[in-house]
UniProtKB/Swiss-Prot annotation:
Keyword set, alphabetical order: Carbohydrate metabolism, Hydrolase
Reactions listed under catalytic activity: alpha-maltose 6'-phosphate + H2O = D-maltose + phosphate
Pfam families: Exo_endo_phos
This protein's name: Maltose 6'-phosphate phosphatase
Source species: Enterococcus faecalis (strain TX4000 / JH2-2)
EC class (word): hydrolase
EC number in record: 3.1.3.90
GO MF annotation list: hydrolase activity
Function statement: Catalyzes the dephosphorylation of intracellular maltose 6'-P formed during PTS-catalyzed maltose transport, leading to the formation of maltose. MapP connects PTS-mediated maltose uptake to maltose phosphorylase-catalyzed metabolism. Is also able to efficiently dephosphorylate turanose 6'-P, and to a much lesser extent, leucrose 6'-P and maltulose 6'-P. Cannot use glucose 6-P, fructose 6-P and sucrose 6-P as substrates.
Entry keyword Phosphoprotein: no
Gene3D superfamilies the record matches: Endonuclease/exonuclease/phosphatase
Null mutant phenotype: Cells lacking this gene grow significantly and reproducibly faster than the wild-type strain on glucose as carbon source. They are able to transport maltose and grow in maltose-containing medium, although at significantly slower rate than the wild-type strain. They seem to accumulate primarily maltose 6'-P when exposed to a maltose-containing growth medium.
High-level lineage: Bacteria, Bacillati, Bacillota, Bacilli, Lactobacillales
Length: 274
């Protein structure tokens, strides 16, 4: 079973449709079963897609309408044209750059029962610090799972920012019974206080990079990007946390310009499980 995650920075890159296609090609070639996407954008002013046309879409109870330029919607359409059908969910987190409805997406080979969990102190959709995390239950080759696609805030204090958001998510996930897969952009580099909150969580999860039998690459950001304007280091801020009982065969950084082209200001991860 393979997992894939990437912060897509969608519609903000040069040649965005080419980059969308590159993401879809790797999903196909890797035969990934579950995919988590962050910074999945659609324009506020673009045309809505009628719900009846979204045949494999799994909405949340308070679903934001899907628009025809929704980046995840277009990826799913591309995959379907190639004969691979994915169920998917998406929900807006906040308005980005004044023109986009920005959110998180999940794709699965099986139907998703999804919800968006507000984890930030801010609740205003126009505030880029408002964070909603997409949480879903789905079947997989490893049984029923709870999967998360998340894009979190930066570290501020032990009571605000990332720390506050992680506490909200942690409390919510602790009520569940299924094995947990948490994928996404934590905005907290490995080894820092924010990362240690997750590493030391009472949730039964482990960092795929740490436990993998084989690793190819490590960092997922290697330059100055939005939110890391002063960065000059290679950072590991995108993660895959998997159930403690799972065996990780390989952790691979993708979309980094080596075997696969750069498609975003973040690199992606491909996790191969035994």
């Amino acid at each position: 079973m393979n997992l894939l995650t990437i912060n897509t920075h969608s519609w903000l890159e040069e040649e965005p449709l080419k980059k969308l296609e590159e993401i879809a090609k790797v999903i196909l070639s890797s035969e990934s079963e579950i995919i988590a996407l962050q910074e999945v954008n659609q324009k506020v002013a673009s045309k809505k897609v009628p719900l009846e046309q979204l045949t494999t879409f799994c909405p949340i109870a308070t679903q934001t309408p899907i628009h025809e330029d929704n980046f995840a919607y277009l990826i799913v359409q591309y995959l379907a044209e190639k004969g691979q059908h994915y169920y998917w969910s998406w929900e807006m987190s906040h308005i980005g750059y004044a023109i986009y409805e920005e959110g998180n997406a999940l794709l699965s080979k099986c139907p998703l029962t999804s919800e968006a969990l507000l984890i930030s102190e801010s609740q205003e959709p126009t505030n880029y610090r408002t964070r909603k995390i997409l949480v879903a239950e789905t079947e997989s080759s490893k049984g029923t799972l709870t999967v998360v696609s998340g894009h979190f805030s930066w570290w501020e204090t032990p009571c605000t920012g990332f720390a506050y958001e992680w506490l909200q998510l942690e409390k919510y996930l602790a009520m569940g019974q299924q094995p947990l897969v948490i994928l996404g952009d934590l905005n907290n580099p490995a080894g820092t206080t924010g990362y240690q909150l997750v590493e030391n969580s009472y949730l039964p999860i482990q960092d795929a990079f740490v436990v993998a039998e084989e690793t190819s690459g490590e960092a997922t950001v290697e330059k100055k990007i939005d939110g890391w304007e002063e960065n000059e280091a290679a950072l590991r801020i995108d993660y895959a946390f998997v159930p403690k009982q799972w065996h990780v065969r390989k952790y691979e950084v993708i979309f980094d310009g080596r075997k696969t082209p750069i498609v975003s200001d973040h690199f992606g991860l491909l996790i191969q499980l035994k």
